[in-house]
């Protein structure tokens, strides 16, 4: 008899929980072999505007996934060293009531105003890849019947990552074992759906495609066995700060570190530097916090979620956003308490640079940060992006400061984090 693992993590402190690899190591080793065709990195895309309702998934005058608009995002990605551009609403089937229905989605057919051939060629010339979106809208069996054709189309156009979606009310997943036959309903986290996610991964792997699942099943470390399962959502992400009532409070992202993120990476989609949701409603965050989230919340694929024009309005954040990697050689929680704050240090896998991200809940705090994680034989240039002295997520969220210092592993930094704020630091070795 084969049974699933059930695990309990016990630690003397919060860092012991965060630094544990227990869940990952309970899974079988890599079954796919060489997956070097997937490159971790950052992406932009047609997404945030849809949640703001300034553009639409559906075709028409407000359609976001047009050839011209996608080209604009490709230019932005290329100019800022991003690897990809996500396009939601690129395919046919979004018109009408797709939520919980999804029976008109076509995953191998582009919308009339989205020229996939032209855009994939343009992206390739710019050194950028398209990231396609497969939203099922509950109609999961319909997706499975198109899966091979959909992956073949994506591979043909140089796509190496697909974001899948399962927007559907609880217990309403549509299962149809025979086309035209009766439809039964499945639970989102039931056995049939668990097997569905594996079927998608396996088909995607045949085409050298990685999967970033939204509205997923919970993470149990299967990315060790199927390393093309690069990330997933699985908790309230940034989209709730567009239209949620309530929005994600500052404590939410802190709590993710000690709960959801214990199981694996999360595509949280940070970097909304406008700090505004739908109807210009304020997002509970400071500007510096949006930078810190790239280090605190781990995912090998991270989105610069805001609109290109909003980044143009905040050039002060772009040096960090261009530099911060998503692939880490080592990571450690250097300070933190459950539900209060978290300070994460990570070393870049492709250089000797270190990064620190610190976030707090609704309360401001001062943190004494020892730099003992740095190489004791080297000096570093610390590029600090912090909350301004009078920053507060409620009253002065854009108060922001940056500075540079020379430091060693023997030094300590005094972090002053505003209520709802954060701090991001890049440590670059000096010769």
PLM regions: where:
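Aromatic- and carboxylate-enriched substrate-binding clefts and catalytic-loop regions
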Residues: 89-275
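Active-site-proximal structural scaffolding
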Residues: 37, 66, 70, 112, ...
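Active-site-proximal substrate-binding groove within the catalytic cores of carbohydrate-active enzymes
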Residues: 200, 207-383, 387-391
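C-terminal beta-sandwich/jelly-roll accessory domains of carbohydrate-active enzymes
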Residues: 360-431
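Conserved structural scaffold segments of CAZyme catalytic domains across common CAZy folds
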Residues: 1-126, 134
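C-terminal substrate/ligand-recognition segments
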Residues: 69-89, 346, 353-362, 415-426
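Flexible loop/turn segments at secondary-structure boundaries
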Residues: 15-16, 51-54, 77, 92-99, ...
């Amino acid at each position: 008899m084969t049974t699933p693992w059930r695990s309990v993590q016990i630690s003397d402190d919060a860092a012991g929980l965060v630094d544990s690899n227990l869940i990952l190591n309970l899974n079988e080793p890599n079954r796919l072999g060489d997956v070097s065709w997937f490159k971790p990195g950052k992406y932009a895309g047609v997404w945030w505007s849809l949640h703001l309702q300034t553009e639409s998934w559906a075709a028409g005058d407000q359609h976001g996934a047009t050839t011209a608009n996608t080209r604009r995002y490709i230019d932005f990605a290329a100019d800022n060293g991003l690897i990809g551009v996500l396009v939601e609403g690129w395919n046919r089937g979004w018109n009408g009531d797709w939520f919980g229905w999804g029976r008109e989605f076509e995953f191998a057919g582009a919308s009339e105003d989205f020229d996939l051939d032209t855009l994939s060629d343009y992206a390739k010339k710019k050194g950028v890849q398209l990231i396609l979106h497969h939203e099922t809208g509950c109609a999961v069996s319909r997706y499975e019947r198109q899966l091979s054709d959909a992956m073949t189309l994506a591979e043909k156009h140089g796509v190496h990552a697909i974001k899948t979606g399962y927007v559907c009310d609880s217990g309403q997943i549509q299962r149809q074992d025979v086309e035209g036959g009766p439809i039964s309903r499945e639970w989102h986290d039931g056995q049939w759906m668990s097997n569905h996610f594996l079927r998608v991964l396996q088909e995607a792997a045949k085409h050298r495609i990685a999967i970033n699942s939204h509205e997923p099943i919970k993470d149990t470390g299967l990315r060790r066995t199927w390393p093309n399962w690069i990330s997933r959502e699985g908790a309230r992400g940034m989209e709730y700060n567009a239209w949620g009532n309530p929005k994600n409070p500052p404590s939410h992202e802190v709590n993710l570190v000690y709960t959801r993120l214990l199981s694996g990476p999360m595509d949280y989609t940070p970097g909304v530097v406008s700090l505004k949701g739908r109807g210009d409603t304020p997002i509970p965050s400071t500007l510096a916090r949006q930078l810190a989230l790239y280090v605190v919340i781990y995912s090998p694929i991270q989105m610069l979620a805001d609109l290109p024009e909003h980044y143009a309005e905040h050039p002060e954040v772009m040096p960090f956003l261009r530099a911060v990697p998503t692939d880490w050689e080592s990571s450690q929680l250097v300070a933190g308490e459950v539900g209060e704050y978290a300070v994460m240090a990570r070393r870049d896998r492709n250089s000797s640079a270190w990064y620190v991200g610190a976030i707090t809940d609704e309360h401001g705090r001062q943190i004494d940060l020892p730099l003992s994680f740095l190489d004791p034989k080297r000096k570093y240039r610390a590029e600090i992006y912090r909350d301004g002295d009078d920053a507060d997520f409620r009253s002065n969220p854009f108060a922001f400061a940056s500075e540079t210092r020379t430091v060693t592993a023997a030094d300590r930094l005094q972090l002053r984090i505003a209520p709802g704020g954060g701090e991001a630091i890049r440590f670059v070795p000096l010769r």
